[in-house]
Amino acid sequence: MSIVVENSTVLSALTEKFAEVFGDTKKVEYFFSPGRINLIGEHTDYNGGYVFPASITIGTTGLARLREDNKVKLYSENFPKLGVIEFDLDDVENKDGELWSNYVKGMIVMLKGAGYEIDKGFELLIKGEIPTASGLSSSASLELLVGVVLDDLFKLSVPRLELVQLGQKTENDYIGVNSGILDQFAIGFGEVKKAILLDCNTLKYEMVPVELRDYDIVIMNTNKPRALTESKYNERFAETREALKRMQTKLDIQSLGELSNEEFDANTDLIGDETLIKRARHAVYENNRTKIAQKAFVAGNLTKFGELLNASHASLKDDYEVTGLELDTLAETAQKQAGVLGARMTGAGFGGCAIALVAHDNVSAFEKAVGEVYEEVVGYPASFYVAQIGSGSTKLDVE
């Protein structure tokens, strides 16, 4: 899969940088991998539920070419002080501390483990536009970028679903974050102006046209420093697993996503612990909320959809406890503004971004009003971007 793009200022600058770092630009190929927003369905993916994400036009660009030896050479425009990171193909099992090169090593390990032959080194220059710790999936964007780079350079013909699953495996088994498949799936399967309703239990999915009429999706970035591995992500994963285990003593279920709200409420005594009940209630209620939200979205009932965004945020705040001052200030201030149908945090939480459904004509006033309140409460500014929904990870044919 590839898309034709014009040689933009960004690509020209990256081409020059590639020549500066690696000597010339012979046989260089171009690639792009998006970030993602999740419209609704948060922390449901690893609980066997539904998610409703879309890939966005902010992402990670890569320039790559094969080498004739065994060396892998990497350079990131985002971390120029690191210079060129170099390792041997025989050394991919050994992690590089906390460096971004681990995502490259992880994808090599997973592809080779799946039986694909990666028998030469390569050079890769990347530039990520996704703000670090924004909750817009910079890590999954990089994993899938590396996936499409290796797939193309080594002519592997990896089925897209397998590539997505290997991206998740890299995150889980190499990096050590117990994430579900939401991020990699959204980034691997994204299409222009379409969201994806994905059942994370079966991996059945439906592409849903994004028809917002006079509304925009505004991304609001807290700009709070955050590392996913330092957040309570793995803790929430463990808590919902424990709640499921306790419910399985009586109920024949494989995941919390199989339960209706009523079935869950009737069996909370099986869990016993109040904190675990809250965690599991979010997973169950959010999953059912997502199914209703998608139907409202398709029917063009954006008012109902917005109300469900608000309910999602409240559940993430009160039951799942993954929001915090910054995200609550953004989402709750946004919900009070003129022209706003709904707002909620998106991504893992603990920082990162929130989204709001805002009338197009109100966006400027909205950003000003929410920005002022946020800076007053938190002490530093938020950033705002209107989301454009674009294609998934792909090779670029540059004209």
From Swiss-Prot:
Active-site positions on this chain: 183
Chain residues that bind substrate: 42-45, 233
MF annotations from Gene Ontology: ATP binding; galactokinase activity; magnesium ion binding
E.C. number: 2.7.1.6
Record pathway: Carbohydrate metabolism; galactose metabolism
Sequence positions that bind ATP: 76, 133-139
The keyword Cell division appears for this protein: no
Cellular localization per UniProt: Cytoplasm
Catalytic function, reaction form: alpha-D-galactose + ATP = alpha-D-galactose 1-phosphate + ADP + H(+)
Principal EC category: transferase
Signal peptide start and end residues: none
Chain residues that bind Mg(2+): 139, 171
Marked site (Transition state stabilizer) residue numbers: 36
One cellular component term from this protein's GO annotations in UniProt: cytosol
Pfam families: GalKase_gal_bdg, GHMP_kinases_C, GHMP_kinases_N
Function as written in the Swiss-Prot or TrEMBL entry: Catalyzes the transfer of the gamma-phosphate of ATP to D-galactose to form alpha-D-galactose-1-phosphate (Gal-1-P).
Name of the protein in its database record: Galactokinase
Encoding gene per record: galK
